[in-house]
Amino acid sequence: PESEIMCVIKADGYGHGAIFLAREYERLGVKRFAVSNIEEAMQLREHGIKSPILILGFTPADLAKVLADNNISQAVLSEEYAEELSKYAQRDSVTVKAHIALDTGMSRIGFMYQNIDRDFASIDTIERVCKLPSLDFEGIFTHFFVSDEAEEGKEDTLCQYKCFDDAIAKLS
C-alpha cells in the first residue's frame, strides 16, 4: 500500500528520450525513476528532474557523496559492495539511500534468492547489510526474467514472485 510506481527510463528511455519521458511522467504524477548508471542519473538532474532516482547498476563506492548530494539511491548488489559504499559514505559524512537488489532468477545482479529452501543465508546477509552505517535502505527489488512471455514464462515468473514475496516476509 505504501509502494510507489517507479518508471525505468534507462538507456535514454529505451530510445524514447529519458528527459522527455521523465518530464511527462512527473507531470502525470510519477514520483520515482530508475536508470542504469550515475551518468544517466546526473543527466536527469542537470535537466531539472527533481524526483528521486534509483541507479540499478554499479556505481563506484567512492561516489557516495555524489549520490547523497543529488538525492540518488543506489542498488546494493552484494555485501562487499554495501560495506564499501558504507565506508565511503562515512568518510564523506553523508547517508546514501539504497535499495536491495534481490536475484530471484535473472542471475545477473543481487543477493541470490532463487530457492526458498536453499538460499536462506541471503536473508541473514541482507539483514546484516541493512544495519551498516550511513546507508538508508528505502526498498528492495527484483527482475522478472520472462514476465513478458504470457504462457511460456508464467510458471517461472510465479516462482520468482513467490521467492520475492517470501524474502519480503522474512525481512519484515
Regions found by a protein language model. Name each.
Residues S3-K170:
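Active-site-proximal beta-alpha core segment in soluble small-molecule metabolic enzymes
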